[in-house]
From Swiss-Prot:
Family, per entry: Belongs to the uracil-DNA glycosylase (UDG) superfamily. Type 6 (HDG) family.
Top-level taxon in the UniProt lineage: Archaea
Listed Gene3D superfamilies: Uracil-DNA glycosylase-like domain
Functional summary from the UniProt entry: Excises hypoxanthine, a deamination product of adenine, from double-stranded DNA. Acts on double-stranded DNA containing G/I, T/I, A/I and C/I base pairs, but not on single-stranded inosine-containing DNA. Also has minor xanthine DNA glycosylase activity. Lacks any detectable uracil-DNA glycosylase activity.
Stored InterPro entries: Hypoxan-DNA_Glyclase, Uracil-DNA_glycosylase-like, Uracil-DNA_glycosylase-like_sf
Name recorded for this polypeptide: Hypoxanthine DNA glycosylase
GO molecular function, one term: hypoxanthine DNA N-glycosylase activity
Organism expressing this protein natively: Methanosarcina barkeri (strain Fusaro / DSM 804)
CDD domains: UDG-F6_HDG
Keywords, comma-separated and alphabetical: DNA damage, DNA repair, Hydrolase
Length: 158
């Protein structure tokens, strides 16, 4: 089944962009980035910016990101995938990253949430951005939350 990604959550103040792969079924139903309750994205990011992002509604989460100059987007504009596993994404269409120069002129750091999105790291690095690949926030990631928190915190240091 073909799935459509979400528009970018970025503006002219965005300095850090986190790129996922493609929204999963629950996120698509909720119309929210990282909408699956088993995904640790909001917990991990909240620990970095010092806010409890899990206890606030989605719109307030996005506002917290903007206050912290953090944007969200996905590598893929669309793709076919059964279920939620990144390894099952096929026939993907890549987003047009060239728009970042105009939409987020202050963007400096692009973080890739997991291996699948990280496969596209060379493209963003070639555009002149600092890049880092994060351990996936997915609930399917078998690494401990503590290990992922440490890796994420290190990636945000500049």
């Amino acid at each position: 089944m073909k799935k459509q990604g979400f528009p970018p959550v970025i503006d002219e103040n965005t300095e850090i962009l986190i790129l996922g792969s493609l929204p999963g079924d629950v996120s698509i139903r909720k119309h929210q980035y990282y909408g699956h309750p088993g995904n640790d994205f909001w917990r991990l990011l909240g620990s970095i910016i010092g806010e409890d992002l899990q206890s606030i509604n989605y719109q307030n989460r996005l506002e917290a990101l903007k206050r912290n100059k953090i944007g969200l987007w996905d590598v893929f504009k669309a793709g076919k995938r059964e279920g939620n596993e990144d390894t099952k994404i096929k026939d993907e269409e890549i987003n047009q990253f060239s728009i970042l120069k105009d939409m987020a002129p202050n963007l400096k750091l692009v973080l890739f949430n997991g291996k699948k999105s990280g496969e596209y790291e060379p493209i963003l690095r070639a555009m002149g951005y600092e890049t880092k690949i994060l351990l996936s926030s997915s609930g399917a990631n078998r690494r401990s939350l503590k290990s992922r928190k440490s890796g994420w915190a290190e990636a945000f240091k500049r």
